[in-house]
Amino acid sequence: MRSDAIKKGHLKAPNRSLLRACGLKDEDFNKPFIGVANSYIDIIPGHYFLNDYAKIIKDEIRKNGCVPFEFNTIGVDDGIAMGHEGMLYSLPSREIIANSIETVMNAHQLDALICIPNCDKITPGMLMGALRVNVPTIFVSGGPMASGVTKKGEKISLSSVFEAVGAYEAKKISEEEFKDIECSACPSGGSCSGMFTANSMNTLCEAMGIALEGNGTILALSKEREELLRKAARRICEIALDERFKIRNIITQKAVRNAMVVDMAMGGSSNTVLHMLAISREAGVALDIKDLNFISSKVAHIAKIAPSLNSVYMDDVHKAGGVSAVMAEISSRQGHILELDALTITGESLKERLKNAKIKDENIIRKVDNAYSKVGGLAILFGNLAEQGCVIKTAGIIGERKFKGKAVCFNSQDEAIKGIIKGKVQKGNVCVIRYEGPKGGPGMQEMLSPTSLLMGMGLGADVALITDGRFSGATRGLSVGHISPEAAEGGLIGLLKDGDEIEIDVDAYTIHANLSEEEITQRKKEFVLPQKEVPSRWLRMYQKLVSNASKGAVLDME
């Protein structure tokens, strides 16, 4: 056992003495030691109940002859951190989470790992850390919350509240309606109820085979979710000493491809691109941002979920057959785009896992021949504005897929929010938000507040927004993020001026500023990088080490 390094032989008597102080008995030193990486925190609705979930898991581990050791990671709630300086810390928290998993698991030489994530950066951070450790690992998330319902009977989610801010600013809804939306949108614990970043990543864990069936869609705080926890705990005990189930044997090139196929079929959050690039790097798997358009071209978008379709939420997807039904439909209709021989954590191949899966409601999960789109729900655009690429969630577009407009430039998200409220962005404009990339922020803030303002003010179909920052999974509209190179590293987005003409063609995968080479060269000569004070030592360190979004915004030590 790996854990023999802390428990076997007379030289390890001091180690055992400390372990005895934690309650271990003689017989425990012959059992596998399993790390239970929890992410319990009171301020995140998807995490406040994870303490109880860890107790269920630890109890099941003990019943099955292993010794659990629980530890916690930090967590940031992107919705609560949104719209103020707190959002600077969201993406950097992914690195802290990864480092903490690696640190605890390797410092104590634990044999296996079960991770309990749920929201935002916590799932990818845990995946990155687990891949560094490379022991048998299972992920079992806290699960999605139920959708909210207004007094009028309309189904809503957190994204509805963000958009209601814009509607209230534009006097399109009353104060009473506004308060009703605020109080109704998040009715229970769990990750926010649509196909936002949390549920996207928990779904992709299922697609990669590192989580059990239902991980992405079974509601939080349900009996079914509790049974999933127990199954996961039993399984980690079965495989704790089996090297076939080391996480790098599960998250392979095939698994990463399967994740991106499901991402395209379900119109996942644009943040998944950022995270999967980072996860692939930790797994030693080749994934280039340029590869994603090929996958998208081969995968129909068959499940449209909030915020792209506000009548459908994760519990609806679960009732309709879940992620397995989506994968089964894609595999039966779209050739060999899915890698069906990929190994899953149960020991089954993906093909075996999907053998009984079927769509139970074609209004929720469509057949390929009735797809929302013949191509996937995400796209990577290239052009002089994004020579290294940028990301758009095509599933969330509500207007035209081809757009030409005049730039209205803002040098921060705060500046943009004030400008939008004051009416500086009009129909036909391209709202440009820059110096919000991984280095420029630093921290690559999400732009949910400005996109939701535009949507709520009725401009969602008539305005494009481009940024070197990123978006919440709750964003919809013609919103282009992750522009690379970013403004802070000399990207063209930093050279734009008000009134410059910008063209976006989603189906041609292009984004272009209509400027001559001579004009661009002249602007580069005149360009002076704005200086931004960064008081935080951690954010200054992050700023120095972080790569741009086209590489997953990972910390680059080379």
Swiss-Prot record:
Matches recorded under SUPFAM superfamilies: IlvD/EDD N-terminal domain-like, LeuD/IlvD-like
Pathway this chain belongs to: Amino-acid biosynthesis; L-isoleucine biosynthesis; L-isoleucine from 2-oxobutanoate: step 3/4; Amino-acid biosynthesis; L-valine biosynthesis; L-valine from pyruvate: step 3/4
Cofactor remark from the record: Binds 1 [2Fe-2S] cluster per subunit. This cluster acts as a Lewis acid cofactor.
Enzyme active site: S472 (proton acceptor)
InterPro entries named in the record: Dihydro-acid_dehy_C, DihydroxyA_deHydtase, DiOHA_6PGluconate_deHydtase_CS, ILV_EDD_C, ILV_EDD_N, IlvD/EDD_N
Organism superkingdom: Bacteria
GO cellular component, one term: cytosol
Binding-site positions, Mg(2+): D78, D120, K121, E446
Record carries keyword Metal-binding: yes
Keywords assigned by UniProt, alphabetized: 2Fe-2S, Amino-acid biosynthesis, Branched-chain amino acid biosynthesis, Iron, Iron-sulfur, Lyase, Magnesium, Metal-binding
GO biological process: isoleucine biosynthetic process; L-valine biosynthetic process
Record PROSITE patterns: ILVD_EDD_1, ILVD_EDD_2
Known EC number: 4.2.1.9
GO molecular function: 2 iron, 2 sulfur cluster binding; dihydroxy-acid dehydratase activity; magnesium ion binding
Required co-factors: [2Fe-2S] cluster; Mg(2+)
Positions of modified residues (N6-carboxylysine): K121
Coiled coil: none
Positions contributing to [2Fe-2S] cluster binding: C119, C192
Oligomer status and interactors: Homodimer.
Function: Functions in the biosynthesis of branched-chain amino acids. Catalyzes the dehydration of (2R,3R)-2,3-dihydroxy-3-methylpentanoate (2,3-dihydroxy-3-methylvalerate) into 2-oxo-3-methylpentanoate (2-oxo-3-methylvalerate) and of (2R)-2,3-dihydroxy-3-methylbutanoate (2,3-dihydroxyisovalerate) into 2-oxo-3-methylbutanoate (2-oxoisovalerate), the penultimate precursor to L-isoleucine and L-valine, respectively.
Family per similarity comment: Belongs to the IlvD/Edd family.
Protein name: Dihydroxy-acid dehydratase
Protein species of origin: Campylobacter jejuni subsp. jejuni serotype O:6 (strain 81116 / NCTC 11828)
